[in-house]
A protein has these predicted regions:
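A glycine-rich, hydrophobic/aromatic-adjacent loop/helix-cap motif
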Residues: 2-172
Length: 172
């Protein structure tokens, strides 16, 4: 989602004051998570915050339970990024981990280039907030700005065009 966008990570990185004023993240690689699908889901929370009134990115595991829509070749593309402990704490807050909107889950990500395997933390929307009856004020689609940020990062990191057009773009 938006965490693969350098501008988004830089925005949060600037909030961290360190004596050496170092960068708090490094993109190590681009990879994919097999047997998962990228989706936008409305985050069903009662809020006046307009940024939470549109759908947000998450990933879902392909299982035999969702066989009718399941794709054996499903994969989610993303960046493999090393972040400082300070930036990680800010990301946890940003992702609503402490409010149970998302949960951090360790997954094995495969490099697109070297096929090296990385253990990485992904953020997955919790069922508590994803599988609720729709609240009429929440859009089932991402905001133009949010989607654009994700699509621009995907283009920058050269994700497959078919993947971008199929999963990341909802606003044609």
């Amino acid at each position: 989602g938006s965490n693969m966008c350098n501008n988004e990570l830089s925005k949060y990185s600037k909030k961290i004051i360190t004596p050496d004023n170092r960068n708090h993240f490094t993109v190590l690689d681009v990879g994919y998570l097999p047997k998962h699908t990228f989706v936008y889901y409305p985050l069903y929370v009662k809020t006046n915050n307009p940024t939470l009134k549109t759908a947000k990115a998450t990933i879902i595991k392909e299982t035999s339970a969702n066989k009718s829509t399941s794709n054996a070749n499903a994969k989610v593309y993303g960046t493999i990024t090393e972040v400082s402990p300070e930036l990680y704490q800010l990301i946890l807050t940003k992702e609503g981990i402490y409010k149970n909107y998302y949960k951090p889950v360790v997954k094995v990500i495969t490099s697109l280039v070297s096929k090296e395997k990385y253990k990485a933390i992904t953020f997955v929307m919790t069922n508590k907030y994803k599988n609720k009856l729709p609240i009429s004020s929440i859009s089932p689609y991402p905001s133009e700005l949010y989607e654009s940020m994700i699509v621009k990062a995907a283009v920058h990191y050269q994700f497959p065009k078919k993947y971008i057009n199929t999963y990341l773009k909802t606003l044609k």
